Structure formats: C-alpha cells, structure tokens
Amino acid sequence: MASSSLLLACVVVAAMVSAVSCGPPKVPPGPNITTSYGDKWLEAKATWYGAPKGAGPKDNGGACGYKDVDKAPFLGMNSCGNDPIFKDGKGCGSCFEIKCSKPEACSDKPALIHVTDMNDEPIAAYHFDLSGLAFGAMAKDGKDEELRKAGIIDTQFRRVKCKYPADTKITFHIEKASNPNYLALLVKYVAGDGDVVEVEIKEKGSEEWKALKESWGAIWRIDTPKPLKGPFSVRVTTEGGEKIIAEDAIPDGWKADSVYKSNVQAK
C-alpha cells in the first residue's frame, strides 16, 4: 500500500496538472495570409473589444498607428489580427470578409473589416479581435447585442480587395517627432491590397529614390545627415507588387504632425 505521503504527493501533482490544463489550449498561429484572393473561406475564432458599438480602441487608434478609425473610410469596421494576419505591421490596412453561422444570432452574411490593430492571444490559428461594431455586423437584424454576449465564436473569413470611395486617396501623416533629418511617415487608406511592403521618397530635382525603414505598424522612417527639403514624391509598394507614385505629395515647408492627402490611389 502506498504511504500517506506518497498519496499526498500524487494528489498535489494531480492538482497541479489540473490547474495547468484549466485554461484554453495554446494554438500555434497559421501560415501568413497573403494576397491570394479567392472564394475559399478559412476558419477563425472571433472576439470583440472596446465599446459595444465602438471602433475598438478607446483612443480610436491601434497598433497600426492609424488615427480616427471610427471615421471614414474605416467607419469603425476594424479588427485586431493575430500574427499571420497582422504580420508585424505588414498586414495593416488589409481587408477581409468575415461571417458566422452559429450561434443563432449569426446572419451568415459577411461583414467587411479592416486590420488596424494586433492581438497575440493564442486561441486559434487565426483570430480576429473585432471592434464591437464589426462583431455586431455579423448578426441578424436586431440581434447584434445578443451576438456580442456570445463572447468567443467560430467564424469563416477570406481576404478581399480594399475598395474606397472615389475621393479617398492614399494619405500620409508626418509623425510628431519628425524634423528635417528624421522623417516618420504613416501611410494609410491604400485601396487594393491595402497593406504596404515598401515606401520610398524622392526629393524635387533628384533621380534617387530613398527607401524608408519600417518603424512600427504602418509607420515608416528615414534618418538622413542631409536635411530633407520638400516638395518630395512618395512611392508606395503594396504586398501584391503594385507601385503607386504620389508626385510632390509632401510640400515644401512640410510640418510634423501634419496630414497630406495625395491625388493617387491603388487599383
């Protein structure tokens, strides 16, 4: 017969194992979602955060660096993405359709969302942490509040092209810390692929395109010993390889914490 101390040890070990296994299992992330558009739907978990009918973050920002994600063209239809969706910032601005068929409040009709933030909860290979507004958009009419009460749900998603109104153009926000020797540029409202893999600038009268480095989210930066002088053009490359040139997008006398709207857009 086992001694009482051995029995006690077994009980303690069993309790420890039980405690460890009580939480949800950690699921490794899936392969990165790329620009392979098609009709195939993939499985994902969806949650929501922020105000029930809000845009997500309390400050209407997020890990991509966008501001005012409650306003056009995002209009609060936003989501955090886990690693294979957010892609360390390279997924910022990409667009997805997402839908659910269960629980009963689900409409099974897709809602269009934009990636504006990140999450790292390992609850599924693909995980969308949606704004309250976007989560509710998957519901049947009048059932959005009921759906939000479900918490975590199973969904299906697919990547789609981003489409914006004709007057929405690629826009640049020069970040607050920028100065003539350091430029930090937030790139937003890119149609088509939505996400950006390269940003370059060219000063007026020069033939040289200077590559910016990724800073964080959708923000790109360049340090230069020679002061940058406007106007300069910006060349943006999307994940699918489309190159868009915004001629003289940043004017002479540009200022930090300023927004400059180009006159170009991706396809």
From Swiss-Prot:
Q: What does this protein do?
A: May cause loosening and extension of plant cell walls by disrupting non-covalent bonding between cellulose microfibrils and matrix glucans. No enzymatic activity has been found. May be required for rapid internodal elongation in deepwater rice during submergence.
Q: Which domain of life is it from?
A: Eukaryota
Instruction: Give start-end of the signal peptide.
Output: 1-22
**Keywords of this protein's UniProt record, alphabetized?**
Allergen, Cell wall, Cell wall biogenesis/degradation, Disulfide bond, Glycoprotein, Membrane, Secreted, Signal
Q: Which GO terms describe its biological process?
A: plant-type cell wall loosening; sexual reproduction
Any one of the GO CC terms: extracellular region
Annotated glycosylation sites: N32
Q: Note whether Transport occurs among the keywords.
A: no
Give the membrane topology, semicolon-separated if more than one.
Answer: Peripheral membrane protein
Instruction: Identify its protein family.
Output: Belongs to the expansin family. Expansin B subfamily.
Any single Pfam family the record assigns to this protein: DPBB_1
Disulfide feature:
C64-C92, C95-C162, C100-C106
Q: Where is the Expansin-like CBD domain?
A: 181-262
Q: Where in the cell is it found?
A: Secreted, Cell wall; Membrane
In which tissues or organs does this protein occur? Expressed in mature anthers but not in vegetative or other floral tissues.
Q: Please name the SUPFAM superfamilies in this protein's record.
A: Barwin-like endoglucanases, PHL pollen allergen
Task: Fetch the Gene3D superfamilies from UniProt.
Answer: Expansin, cellulose-binding-like domain (2.60.40.760), RlpA-like domain (2.40.40.10)
**UniProt xrefs under InterPro entries:** Expan_Lol_pI, Expansin/allergen_DPBB_dom, Expansin_CBD, Expansin_CBD_sf, LolPI, RlpA-like_DPBB, RlpA-like_sf
Supply the name of the protein: Expansin-B1
